Design a protein with these regions (language model features):
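N-terminal signal-anchor transmembrane helix
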Residues: 1-2
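Conserved acidic residues
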Residues: 6-7, 142
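Catalytic core of membrane glycerolipid acyltransferases/transacylases, capturing the structured
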Residues: 7-86
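Phosphate/oxyanion-binding active-site loops and adjacent basic polyanion-contact surfaces
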Residues: 14-18, 90-93, 203-207
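Secondary-structure boundary elements
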Residues: 28-37, 96, 102-110, 139-140
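A cross-family acyltransferase "interaction/gating" segment
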Residues: 58, 107-197
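A Trp-anchored, charged/polar loop motif used as the substrate-binding/catalytic surface
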Residues: 89-103, 128
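Short, cationic low-complexity segments
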Residues: 195-209
Length: 209
């Protein structure tokens, strides 16, 4: 960032405490660069955080973020009229988010993305898989950090998985580990080269790497 490079953080997503925990660790354990990086993080957030509940929205607004309309949200709509309406809404929101994303990069911020686009749910392995849109982020940024998380103190309530206010608080140790700084272009090129030659759409393969 100090050299003017566009930086991307790809972070595992287990709970709504992931971003606060990362910022806390950067502020308190990040040596000379941590507090500066913490202040420069802009998170990509699904609109669910804005619409699920006023309390959830208020809590989310404590962090700088860009709101998007996730593509997987359209997949569950079966009514044609509703799909057309939501598709138009999706395009408007995501066009605005792309302009905001471009502005953030130019201002020297680090953009944080949760590759799965949702919190991981035990027993639902697809919630841990990266979305194919992550390939587009790799093409938009110069360098990236991959951040893994072990431990979770705010867990999804199995009896109310869609209600964020019903999340269960646990005492736990949360350890976040970061990769070395990776060159996005080189990473993507290597992944593309490793993909099977007969694979038509290589984006999911790149994201899975």
């Amino acid at each position: 960032l100090r050299e003017g490079k566009r930086a991307l953080l790809l972070v595992e997503h287990f709970s709504n405490m992931d971003l606060p925990a990362l910022c806390y660790l950067l502020d308190h354990c990040g040596k000379d660069f941590g507090p500066e990086l913490s202040k420069r993080i802009v998170a990509i957030a699904g609109m669910k955080l804005n619409e699920a509940n006023p309390m959830v929205k208020a809590w989310a607004e404590g962090f700088t973020r860009i709101v998007i309309y996730p593509s997987r949200s359209l997949a569950s709509i079966t009514d044609p009229a509703e799909l057309e309406k939501e598709s138009a809404k999706s395009r408007a929101i995501n066009m605005a988010s792309m302009r905001a994303l471009d502005r953030c990069k130019k201002e020297g911020n680090a953009v944080l993305v949760f590759p799965s686009g949702t919190r991981y749910r035990p027993g639902v392995p697809e919630t841990r898989e990266g979305l194919r849109e992550i390939d587009s982020y790799l093409r938009l940024f110069d360098v990236m950090l991959l951040v893994s998380t072990n431990g979770n103190c705010l867990r999804i309530n199995p009896d109310a998985p869609e209600d964020m206010l019903a999340d269960l608080v646990y005492e736990d140790v949360v350890i976040m580990s970061a990769s070395p700084v990776l060159n996005c272009k080189e990473f993507r090129a290597q992944a593309m080269a490793e993909a099977p030659e007969d694979m038509e759409d290589k984006k999911p393969f790149v994201v899975a790497k």
